[in-house]
Regions:
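A short beta-loop-alpha structural element at the N-terminal edge
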Residues: 2-17, 67
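Active-site rim helix/loop that mediates acceptor-substrate recognition in acyltransferases
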Residues: 28-50, 55, 64
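Conserved beta-strand in the GNAT
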Residues: 52, 58-67, 118, 131-136
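Conserved GNAT acetyl-CoA-binding A-motif
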Residues: 128-129, 157-170
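Conserved active-site alpha-helix within GNAT-family acetyltransferase domains
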Residues: 115-118, 147, 159, 171-188
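Conserved beta-strand-loop-alpha-helix junction that forms the acyl-donor binding cleft
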Residues: 133-138, 166-176, 191-195
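Conserved acetyl-CoA-binding loop-helix of GNAT-fold acetyltransferases
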Residues: 142-155, 180
């Protein structure tokens, strides 16, 4: 059983490790961990809402959603947690100018992750009411965790009047998770940076009573 609740600032270190274990497998230095903490904080604060899953007092997963302006401008401007804009700028400039001094193995893996992320461009069909921005978990807690987080995400969307949710993912990620929960394939595009694989967009339409 997992306790699902709203994200709090104290959850940043645990969320950073969830993010790491979802996408990377190389050893980490303290500099790598510092970057992951800043990245997780910015990701959670820039979006509309984040839910975390707790197991025995430890955060072992999180899900993030962002309302689109075309759906509701007021909702799109709101954040469940207070944004720390100085932290955002610090993260951006340290990353851009190599200030984190990341280890070579982690930097190599993150560079590939970032290239995939940048495939989300102007031609990506993400017009929807709410975008599912991230779903991450610790490796040892995945059975039932994604479903529990998705159920909380879906309930939040339905209560907000959301009719459509879309997610940008890729063939290297667990896109089958979304298919099993009713998401339908919308779009695909081969990677543009020479690596085998495709970017994907999935959509689900929510039924509101």
């Amino acid at each position: 059983m997992f306790l699902i609740r709203k994200f709090e600032e104290r959850d940043v270190p645990d969320c950073a490790m969830c993010f790491y274990e979802s996408f990377f497998d190389c050893p980490l230095t303290e500099n790598d961990k510092a970057f992951l903490r800043d990245y997780a904080q910015v990701l959670a604060e820039k979006c509309s809402f984040t839910y975390v899953a707790e197991s025995e007092g430890q955060v072992v997963g999180f899900i993030i959603g962002h309302y689109k302006k075309d759906f509701d401008k007021a909702l799109a401007k709101l954040h469940d947690v207070k944004p720390h804009y100085k932290a955002w700028f610090r993260c951006f400039f340290k990353f851009a100018f190599g200030g984190y001094k990341m280890s070579a193995p982690f930097k190599a893996q993150f560079d590939v992750f970032y290239k995939k992320l940048k495939e989300n461009g102007k031609d990506t069909p993400l017009a929807c009411d709410c975008e599912l921005m991230a779903l991450c978990s610790r490796r040892d807690y995945r059975k039932g965790l994604g479903t529990a987080l998705w159920n909380a995400f879906r309930k939040r969307c339905e209560e907000s009047g959301v009719k459509t949710v879309r997610v940008f993912t890729d063939t290297d990620a667990t896109y089958t998770f979304y298919e099993k929960r009713g998401f339908k394939f919308v779009w695909e595009k081969p990677y543009s940076f020479g690596m085998l694989g495709k970017s994907l967009v999935y959509e689900i339409k929510l039924n509101r009573g």
